[in-house]
């Protein structure tokens, strides 16, 4: 699975790099190249999501983690190999949803933070933002399952006599990262789910006209 993570991360990295090149050519000279601000915003948004959720996290945590953590603990495999499998296979459909979101209507041109009111159903009436939110949900589930797996593996699968203070710093870094991920990702999930209901079920979590607060989204997102 570690190898699959690497392959997936490299592929997503190539997609992200091509988006990055579009951004650089647009900004590299005066005047407009794409002649469409919405399209540029969509490229920036997709670039942010792809590079974080589909390149950096799968390669740095999924790839290196799966290869090195069991090796450094003296464990035969991760604590939950089948959950590990599921963590990986949630990513391709997630990436597909993200790419679909940029193809539907005029794409999700909200910036990678998906801030309201830019992501409200007034600014983006079509399903593009909803698809992006579903994509984030899948990527988040994958990350949370992976984090649970890493924490359990590091706590329970060490060689006898391999105390926590004798662990390599790489294992510690994965351990701490997984704990922080497990704390913060559900908050982001709550924020984007509230945004989803704002868009589709007439709630007003982030809509000032209904007593909501768009700054609340920023608090939840950046937590």
Swiss-Prot record:
Catalytic activity as recorded in UniProt: 4 Fe(II)-[cytochrome c] + O2 + 8 H(+)(in) = 4 Fe(III)-[cytochrome c] + 2 H2O + 4 H(+)(out)
UniProt: Ca(2+) binding residues: 26, 31
Descriptive protein name: Cytochrome c oxidase subunit 1
Family that this chain belongs to: Belongs to the heme-copper respiratory oxidase family.
Organism per entry: Doryteuthis pealeii
Gene: COI
Main location: mitochondrion
PROSITE patterns hit by this protein: COX1
UniProt pathway annotation: Energy metabolism; oxidative phosphorylation
Keyword Iron: yes
UniProt membrane topology term: Multi-pass membrane protein
Segments crossing the lipid bilayer: 5-27, 47-69, 89-111, 131-153, 174-196
Gene Ontology BP terms: electron transport coupled proton transport; mitochondrial electron transport, cytochrome c to oxygen
InterPro entries, per the entry: Cyt_c_oxase-like_su1_dom, Cyt_c_oxase-like_su1_sf, Cyt_C_Oxase_1
Segments in the Mitochondrial intermembrane topological domain: 28-46, 112-130
Entry's cofactor comment: Binds 2 heme A groups non-covalently per subunit.
């Amino acid at each position: 699975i570690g190898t699959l993570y690497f392959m997936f991360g490299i592929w997503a990295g190539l997609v992200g790099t091509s988006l990055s090149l579009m951004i650089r050519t647009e900004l590299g000279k005066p005047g407009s190249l794409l002649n469409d601000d919405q399209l540029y915003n969509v490229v920036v948004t997709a670039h942010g999501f792809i590079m974080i959720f589909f390149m950096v996290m799968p390669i740095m945590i999924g790839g290196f983690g799966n290869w090195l953590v069991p090796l450094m603990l003296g464990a035969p495999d991760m604590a939950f190999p089948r959950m590990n499998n599921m963590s990986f296979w949630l990513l391709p459909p997630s990436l597909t949803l993200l790419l679909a979101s940029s193809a539907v209507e005029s794409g999700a041109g909200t910036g990678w933070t998906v801030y309201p009111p830019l992501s409200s159903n007034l600014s983006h009436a079509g399903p593009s933002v909803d698809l992006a939110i579903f994509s984030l949900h899948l990527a988040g589930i994958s990350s949370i399952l992976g984090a649970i797996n890493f924490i359990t593996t590091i706590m329970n699968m060490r060689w006898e006599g391999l105390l926590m203070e004798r662990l390599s710093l790489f294992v510690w870094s994965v351990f701490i990262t997984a704990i922080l991920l497990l704390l913060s990702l559900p908050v982001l999930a709550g924020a984007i789910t509230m945004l989803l209901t704002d868009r589709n079920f007439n709630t007003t979590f982030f809509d000032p006209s209904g007593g909501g607060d768009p700054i609340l989204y920023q608090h939840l997102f950046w937590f």
